[in-house]
Amino acid sequence: DAKAVISVVGSYTDEYSKSNIANMTYGYVRWSEVYDMFIDKRVEVGNHSYDFHSNNHGRNGSKRNSGESEDTYRNIFVDDTQKAQDRFMTKTGFAPIIYTYPFGAYSEETTDMLKSMGFKMSLTCNEGINHITDADSLFMLKRYNRPSGISTADFFAKMGID
């Protein structure tokens, strides 16, 4: 049995929960489906931000902007992350303990902020092997992010798996 991690962007889930219309080029889940995932023993739901998964706000994911003060960044990051956590609680009764960085973009302050908010793990887009030794090594985990348009065989070959 393998367990999947599904990382949810709160603003997208709010948008797609308003109707039964699905976007065929960029499918997304509704809050009722997120609830089903939380209660499924094979799925771990992660927080993928509330609204950092776009470049519309002049920010690269959840990364601190150049010239932005640490206090301003902290407020923006914590507000967005907490907004998502609050939506998870309101809509499903659960809150994630995993944070997945939008676009894999992060700053050196983010791990401490996530820990202070009760998160137990974070996922980057850095590729590589993780060596889990203690609770702290569950932050900034590497992963192989499979983009669209690549076959399963090519994806695994890239990792050296035949």
Label each residue range with its predicted role.
Residues 2-107, 139-141:
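Metal-dependent polysaccharide deacetylase catalytic core of the NodB/CE4 family, i.e.
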Residues 89-92, 111, 115-149, 157-162:
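C-terminal domain-boundary segment and adjacent tail
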